[in-house]
C-alpha cells in the first residue's frame, strides 16, 4: 500500500466518520425532539388537570359560601319574623282587651245584635236577636237564593 492509498483511505475514513456523525446526530436530535414533545404533552395534560382541580376547589368554596350566606339570611329572616310576631301578639292582646271593654260598654249602654246563619243549597236561613236595653226582638227568616243555571 502506497501513500496514495493511505491518503485515500484516510479521506474515506473521514467521510465515513462524518456520515456516521451526521447520522448519529440526526438520531440524537430525533430522540431529543421526541422526548421534548412527550414532555410538552405531559406538561399540557398536567396543566389541564391543575385547571380542573382549581375549578373544583373554587366551585366547592363557592358552594360552601353560598350555603353559609343562605343560612345567615334564613336565620335573619327567622329573627325578624319572631320579633314581628311578638309585636303582633302584644298588639293582638291589646286589641282583645279593648274589644272586651268596648263590647261590655256597648252592650250595657246601647244593646247588641246576635245571630247566626245557615246556608243550604238554594236558601239562606237567618236567626237574629236584637237587644236594646230591656227590649228584645227575635227575627227568623228564610230567604230563597236566585240560582242561575
Curated annotation (Swiss-Prot):
List cystine links: none
Q: What is this protein called?
A: IQ domain-containing protein F5
**PROSITE patterns found in the cross-reference section:** IQ (PS50096)
Task: Give the originating organism.
Answer: Bos taurus
> What UniProt keywords are attached to this protein's entry?
Repeat
According to the UniProt entry, its GO molecular function terms are: calmodulin binding
Segments spanning the bilayer are none
Domain of life the protein comes from = Eukaryota
